[in-house]
Amino acid sequence: MTTDEGTSNNGENPAATMTEQGEDITTKKDRGVLKIVKRVGTSDEAPMFGDKVYVHYKGMLSDGKKFDSSHDRKKPFAFSLGQGQVIKAWDIGVSTMKKGEICHLLCKPEYAYGSAGHLQKIPSNATLFFEIELLDFKGEDLFEDSGVIRRIKRKGEGYSNPNEGATVKVHLEGCCGGRTFDCRDVVFVVGEGEDHDIPIGIDKALVKMQREEQCILYLGPRYGFGEAGKPKFGIDPNAELMYEVTLKSFEKAKESWEMDTKEKLTQAAIVKEKGTVYFKGGKYTQAVIQYRKIVSWLEMEYGLSEKESKASESFLLAAFLNLAMCYLKLREYNKAVECCDKALGLDSANEKGLYRRGEAQLLMNDFESAKGDFEKVLAVNPQNRAARLQISMCQRKAKEHNERDRRVYANMFKKFAERDAKEEASKAGSKKAVEGAAGKQHESQAMEEGKAKGHV
């Protein structure tokens, strides 16, 4: 469907055809963006606001001169739809396309580069012609781990988002395997959705939503109901879920700067207890949310009285130690080490902090550091039998690791030696072949000379 020239087969400029036949797809109906479908798409689904879209395109000025082409670069162009990453005409035009569709767009300056133009290729107030092929699109990966994919059906209002602790009113519909298992309006506190049988992925997504936004969320098991599943809803362990969520309204929780020290200490006691309840119930991600609140409120709090300072330090120490335990359970060992470091910064001889950091380092195969921490535990409490066992574990694991490395390197060197021997043998064989060929050639030449002499 693409050509290198800006004219059609009969020599007609496509911009002229667009002006006559193009559909006005602007909301204002000001003919700022005209569209003609050149090839119908392969599905009925169109990309949504925020989707990552992949296109091939060719751009021309209104006189037919090509100024850009992804085909020339042999690489599709990708952008997030509706985020202002491309000219307005593209956000408008691509949102109307279906996967596999090829269309032509004619874009007036106010929907393109306006009076500024672009670099030296596009002059001021230029009307542009594009041929675009929509190759693919996919939802926004909210946390860049493929755990929560969002597709926005209706863009929200304003720029404000709920924060952790905000009270939200939402409508949600949950589906699994094509079956709707939950459909209701519900009011809850962000970070405490578990209390209302709402998976943690919804809590985390809500802090990225705006009022009246309607979106589809695809949740992986980690952000859904996890290994436990949800028998109440008939959800099996490690099931993937789909939710359609509408954020009807929300009231933000107080930010740290809006609270005085007394209020922060009061709230710290409350969320510490909530975190403990979640932890005991195996809801480690939810527990992390609660313990992190304590850190956000108190870590940078200054000008406290002696009594407030002691209370603050006690809450922070407990929060860091509990966060470390949560991260150990979640297998996020680097974060566990960081939290232990923070705890030990408050109390360098803290037995739990040293032990948990040792555990995390052992699980990261840093045997020497782990052994060092467990030895420090014994220095603090010589009766800690678990630390003694862990030291033995570190020594055994280090020995096994070194033995495994020795075998790997021995096999590696053996392979290198065998390869070198083959190369030497090959070279020697080649040399003999060359010498043999040279000898035969010399012998042949001598025979020819003998024949010549005999003939004479």
Curated annotation (Swiss-Prot):
Classification via SUPFAM superfamilies: FKBP-like (SSF54534), TPR-like (SSF48452)
Cross-referenced Pfam families: FKBP_C, TPR_1, TPR_6
Modified residues (N-acetylmethionine): 1
Chief location bin: cytoplasm
Lineage of the organism: Eukaryota, Metazoa, Chordata, Craniata, Vertebrata
TPR repeat locations: 268-301, 317-350, 351-384
Domain PPIase FKBP-type: 50-138, 165-251
Catalytic activity: [protein]-peptidylproline (omega=180) = [protein]-peptidylproline (omega=0)
Positions of post-translational Phosphoserine modification: 444
Regulation: Inhibited by both FK506 and rapamycin.
Function field: Immunophilin protein with PPIase and co-chaperone activities. Component of unligated steroid receptors heterocomplexes through interaction with heat-shock protein 90 (HSP90). Plays a role in the intracellular trafficking of heterooligomeric forms of steroid hormone receptors maintaining the complex into the cytoplasm when unliganded. Acts as a regulator of Akt/AKT1 activity by promoting the interaction between Akt/AKT1 and PHLPP1, thereby enhancing dephosphorylation and subsequent activation of Akt/AKT1.
N6-acetyllysine PTM positions: 28, 155
Annotated source species: Mus musculus
Protein name, per record: Peptidyl-prolyl cis-trans isomerase FKBP5
Keyword entries, A-Z: Acetylation, Chaperone, Cytoplasm, Isomerase, Nucleus, Phosphoprotein, Repeat, Rotamase, TPR repeat, Ubl conjugation
PANTHER family: PEPTIDYLPROLYL ISOMERASE
Region (Disordered): 1-24, 421-456
Single GO molecular function: protein-macromolecule adaptor activity
One Gene Ontology term, aspect cellular component: cytosol
Top-rank taxon, per record: Eukaryota
Keyword rRNA-binding recorded: no
GO biological process: chaperone-mediated protein folding; response to alcohol; response to bacterium; response to cocaine
